């Protein structure tokens, strides 16, 4: 082993990185389950509910357009009412199932190429994003830079607000950085529209001080894994000499005022990578993302997202990434009905365990019996927005 000199000690991670500060800025001081439980209590006790009913009528073949048109005219008062869905030309009565079905169809179709609202990179995630739980090649979506339907983007934010308020579970394929943007404080989010905001000071993401991390180079990996790998190998892991920067035309053009006159060097390459990622992920689509954020924050969340990070937010609306038979069984009310002389419920439990061997088998079962492909992070509890409660037979 070699003894550190003074210069080496100044740059060594042991002396330059505070794991406690990193945990605090990323919202990881409190465990995810505790944060979600505290948030659920806020929704139950603090958020206003209206006894009135908000009807919407949609068509299955154009559910995205119809839902966005309805939510575009909604204000806070509309979102606080109980939502009742009616499908055009159908006589079904919504006891909660049609609402879940509508959300499932909506978030399945909104990412379709012909809708034109969202885009994904061709190669998707690199599959090494850890806690996010993305597979290699899995495509995640961000608003299209070509989409001028800003009012629809704002309406989408209201849809997400309703999903959160009522405790629904959706299968949303948003890039994690979208959740991160929704969690930023207003000043930071607005500032990212001008040349992507601050550059941060580390390989990962900087700290915004509001419980979430600002957007940086590491966030690019879950959206465009191939570009992330290229920048990682050709810039981060390279010694940037003047000749190398000149050959690759590496400068800060479009990333800061007069950026075309600032050359990338070995000293500022991390700042460059953070700004480049912010420009790709946020700057180019800032109007669309800001509209979603505006719609989402129409409800008074107060400080209840302050300690959330993007993984917490994703779990809040999508439920746990991994679902096993035990989790599903825990959300079944086996005391409902008279099954004392029947072994049916035993067979149900065995059947669910067999579905673990089939890809998405449990999610298909949940979609069939509940209308949603997942289980809420806090379980199937009867609430104002979820009148059905646990699964029962």
Which residues are covered by each model-predicted region?
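Extended low-complexity, proline/serine/acidic/glycine-rich cytosolic segments
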Residues: 1-138, 194-196, 200-209, 213-215, ...
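Alpha-helical repeat scaffolds in large eukaryotic proteins
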Residues: 5-8, 12-15, 19, 107, ...
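C-terminal catalytic/scaffold cores in eukaryotic proteins
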Residues: 46-50, 175-393
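Surface-exposed beta-strand-to-loop junctions
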Residues: 77-89, 130-141, 154-158, 268-273, ...
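Intrinsically disordered, low-complexity regions enriched in proline, serine, glycine
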Residues: 96-97, 115-122, 143, 168-174, ...
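Intrinsic disorder
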Residues: 79, 89, 93-101, 146-150, ...
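Alpha-helical catalytic/interaction cores of small GTPase-regulatory modules
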Residues: 126-130, 135-179, 184-190, 358
